[in-house]
Amino acid sequence: MDNLNLISNFAEFKELKNIDKSTMIGVLEDVFRHALQKQYETDENFDVIINPEKGDLEIWRNRTVVEDGAVENPNTQIAVSEVKAIDPTYEIGDEYADEIKLASFGRRAVLSLRQNLASRILDLEKASLYEKYSEKVGEIVTGEVYQVWKKEVLILDDEGNELILPKTEQIPNDYYRKGDTIKAIVKRVEMNNNQPRIILSRTANQFLERLFEQEVPEIFDGLITIKKIVRIPGERAKVAVESYDERIDPVGACVGMKGSRIYSIVKELRNENIDVVNYTANPSLMIQRA
């Protein structure tokens, strides 16, 4: 690839968030083929070769060798005398390939190509991020506090993606400073002005449920089920559990030896008072237990 600094280093594509290499190569080829169509009215007789490992890109034009004076389309045909001046072994009817340098496109076309490539990469990153976190809705994620505002906290995940924890989704006793590690559940993913907005929550009942799944193997394995959660975030919560194995005490398993399992959950929720009770389908009995 010539020194137009169109793509300074293909290795940088490996650092692009949320985009796999094969997708990136497809976008690159598509952008360059679009430029070829504008420049030559077709890209059918061109080969675009992208090698991200070596960090280069080549464009080759394939033309048919024809008799002198028989060239009707200089983009798809080349006179035999012209090609023999380069390589005497070529004959009429052969296919001749010559490399196309980006400089031949012209400065304006190269600038347009740069802009198109940057726009496509940005759109691809946004779409990939939206899809990635849409699949994570209901899951716990961990990130680092980057900025604390009055109405929300800006969090960065391990890839530098921006996540939002609104004030309304924070536990009343939550207090954060830049650099703090934060754990929350992905509540929803929105698309505002073509920009993904990933909303987290620490007040959702599902956050408490996922914390129990992390701390109690029997819940994670499906031996114990959380049937219902009633919660005032940061103050208290009632968690009704049921065991599918008569040998397992669901309440005891959730609390752990001397409260070892539930302690980390209480700590994560700013000392929220959590009561774990046995579930029953009898409403009046359930009220008594609660």
Regions found by a protein language model. Give the residues of each.
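RNA-contacting regions in translation and RNA-metabolism proteins
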Residues: 1-290
